[in-house]
Amino acid sequence: FDPLDGSSRDLPEKSVGADGRTTVLLHFEPTQALFLVLRDGEPTSTSGVNFPHLKPVMTVEGPWTVTFDAAWVKPLPPSVAPGSKEVSVAFDQLADWSKRPEDGIKWYSGVATYRKSFNLPAGVRPNRPMFLDIGVVKEMARVQLNGQDLGVAWCPPWRVAVPAGLLKASANQLVITVANTWNNRLCV
């Protein structure tokens, strides 16, 4: 049982020794916790693998549009008019805003929204369930794909499940809303 997302699964890769002890093959992501529930007498699957190997299908590359609450961007970039509600910045790739050269962005503390449109490469079947790995996030991120909320990633492995059929061949809209802590602003 995975307490992070509430999922559970059979663990077919197991053996029971002559002494009655059960040995189960487990795989943990860094800092991950799982509950192992052993039940007497309940049939479980004996074929398959405990933890399927996830293989990358594609990388969402290219520019992202990132918006920040202008009230918390200090100093404002020269291109932003005083009184603006948002500051919109183009990032070359999905990246940590605290690594940006602009002081108002680098020291920003609050919520920022990353937006990206992308197409699936030829050969990728959108009718299969997948995972979206968003890399390391500081501190948490809510992920939406094509208008559907995929949940919050707040610890490793920094990924969310993408239900079968949600992806389209083209014009997929990915929105990642990231929140950090005041620590970033206090470092100034």
Task: State where each predicted segment sits.
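Aromatic-lined ligand-binding clefts that engage carbohydrates, nucleic acids, or primary amines
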Residues: W107, F118-L120, V124-N146, L174-V178
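Solvent-exposed beta-strand/loop surfaces of large extracellular or lumenal domains
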Residues: F1-T22, K138, Q144-V160
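Short, hydrophobic/aromatic-enriched beta-strand segments in well-ordered soluble domains
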Residues: L34-G41, K116, Q173-N180
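Surface-exposed, short loops/turns at beta-strand junctions within beta-sandwich domains
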Residues: F28-E29, L166-A169
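Short beta-strands within extracellular/lumenal beta-sheet-rich domains
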Residues: Y108-A122, W158-A161
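Extracellular Ig-like/FN3 beta-sandwich strand-entry sites
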Residues: A33, N127, A169-A171
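C-terminal beta-strand-rich structural cap/linker in extracellular carbohydrate-active enzymes
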Residues: G20-T44
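An acidic-aromatic loop/edge-strand motif
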Residues: T44-G110, K168-V188
